[in-house]
Amino acid sequence: MAATPDDAPGKATWAELGPAARGFRIAHAAFSVIQLSCLGYVWYCALTRRRDRLLTASVATLLFEAGALWVGRGDCPFGPLQSRLGDPVPLFELVLPKRAAKAAIPVLFTIAVAGLAAVLLRPPSRASRTDR
């Protein structure tokens, strides 16, 4: 059978990873799920005009991630650590084809900026002003 780009050397399977790489992959995936949840909540608040502490925490989390990506010059700053732990595969490449994985950061950044703009441009509803 011919090798595909996804079968490229260096793509470690779960069984091939050491305990530190497995733990890091789990933590990294969990943090990614939290970030995607924050992004979803920002959009929920934009659409419903809701304002609360969870929105503030979600925005702070997304801004933290934006800062980390800025430090990493568009790549996850954990990449070198992940490689040193024996896991050379970027997280997005575990679930997306390589080309889509490369596009994920700019696409998610655009969605996040649009969500934050929507929150800022749509005034809060009266009900959410009392939720603080």
What are the residue ranges of the model-derived segments?
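Short amphipathic, positively biased membrane-proximal segments
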Residues: 1-132
